[in-house]
């Protein structure tokens, strides 16, 4: 799943101090010195264009105070621009073997009837802000038919749903007989990553790092405080 590809980097003022991935799994609890930190998380595959391959990124700043428990949450949002293609049923009456290419300057995907349920994921570079498309097919008279266009100012975390349909009025006047509609919608897809500092365990009115001595049969109560950022499943105490 998406979590198997997750990479987490934690930075301090000195630079990168922790790195976790599928080979070096991040523990549930981290032991960090007091100070300011920045965490950056990525998940998925960052490729120019691919079907059903999301890519998530997220970052957050957090501070660790001495003697306190800290929990940092990173919200990872989708970094891709998405595209889907649908064909109206009447297209099959006027054109065959049709397909649509949707592409950027770095990646291209071909959509056919067999891929109408697939979602194309595109990574836009710094200057690329458009999705170009081309329709190719063969008319009933055997001649090839092509039509193309561009959707400008596309953004990430947004899906562009292309619908290709037959326009009989344009066909009758010799114009382009394919109508193209593009519906734009925001993609609200996130993954949360929680980074937790090790629980704080202290003695009540005594130093827990030092032994407690009692005479036989004359012990007294001793309280231990466990301060955790998240709910603990269990706490085990032992003595010798």
Q: Which residues make up each language-model segment?
A:
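Extracytoplasmic cysteine-anchoring/structural motifs
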Residues: 1-6, 11-13, 24, 31-55, ...
């Amino acid at each position: 799943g998406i979590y198997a590809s997750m990479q987490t980097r934690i930075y301090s003022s000195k630079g990168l101090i922790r790195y976790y991935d599928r080979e070096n799994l991040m523990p549930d609890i981290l032991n960090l010195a007091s100070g300011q930190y920045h965490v950056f998380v990525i998940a998925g595959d960052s490729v120019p264009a691919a079907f059903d391959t999301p890519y998530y990124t997220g970052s957050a700043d957090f501070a660790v105070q001495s003697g306190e428990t800290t929990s940092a949450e990173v919200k990872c949002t989708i970094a891709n621009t998405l595209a889907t293609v649908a064909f109206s049923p009447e297209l099959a009456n006027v054109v065959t073997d049709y397909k649509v290419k949707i592409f950027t300057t770095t990646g291209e995907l071909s959509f056919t009837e067999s891929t109408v349920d697939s979602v194309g994921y595109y990574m836009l570079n710094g200057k690329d802000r458009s999705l170009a498309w081309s329709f190719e097919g063969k008319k009933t008279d055997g001649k090839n038919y092509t039509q193309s266009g561009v959707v400008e100012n596309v953004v990430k975390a947004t899906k562009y749903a292309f619908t290709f349909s037959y326009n009989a009025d344009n066909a009758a006047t010799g114009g382009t007989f394919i109508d193209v509609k593009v519906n734009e919608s925001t993609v609200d897809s996130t993954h949360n990553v929680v980074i937790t500092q090790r629980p704080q365990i202290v003695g009540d009115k005594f130093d827990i790092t030092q032994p407690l001595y009692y005479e036989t049969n004359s012990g007294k109560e001793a309280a231990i405080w466990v301060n955790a950022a998240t709910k603990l499943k269990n706490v085990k105490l032992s003595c010798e």
